[in-house]
């Protein structure tokens, strides 16, 4: 790797010392079942303390100790104090259930353009039909205007919560380069690391690699050269997943798998969770309670009539908290106890 390293990156020794204070952790990428995207989760009119408290109680019963949660720059732009107040409330709910979440700032996945206010209804049977990229792509061309706005957002959040012991870590950018952005996302990725380092948070920073192809090498090299904790996404089966773990272990830093478990892709709790536990990799699967994001449906396999998929893609629980697969839930509890 010959990527630039922004000043302030933790040494491997500091990162490993930080990780040594924690037992092995499992958790999930989380959004409440009644929100269809990040904007709906965090907006004042739709933030739902009671549902979050209920669902995190179920997460606690599974033995989950962390969550990965996506923030919203659009909500911040329209209601900065409100977003921080709701984040504080969310962290209090997490703490009451023994959970330390990580927060995600930027995202290159799904819908390119988004707006504040009431969100479109989810498309029946379509995976993540209303999830939004962040920042909205219509804002990205005018970087002279956008970057100062993002500076205020990122640094206000990190100044407010960067020394809050309820936060596990900061995931600065989800899947940079996705949605055909490619290396055009590198300036924004670099920018968010610079902004975050200037705040000197007590928690580690990361940005997970997710596609190991030649065209993504500039992004991957930058992410691996700047993350305090190495994070990655892997929806493959156990053999290929373990190869990825061993390759990343050579970097000498703690590892977090921040997305896995897609049943129809061959990524199962029963095969991947024990692998992650054995290698002491933080295990974060996509989805807790199935709901408006429709992530029980697979990528590219819509069910416009709303019929149930033969096999759920993501998610663990039904909206009433009952398991999709009782045997699977029992297995998760056995791994996390």
Task: List each model region and its residues.
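Short amphipathic alpha-helical segments
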Residues: 243
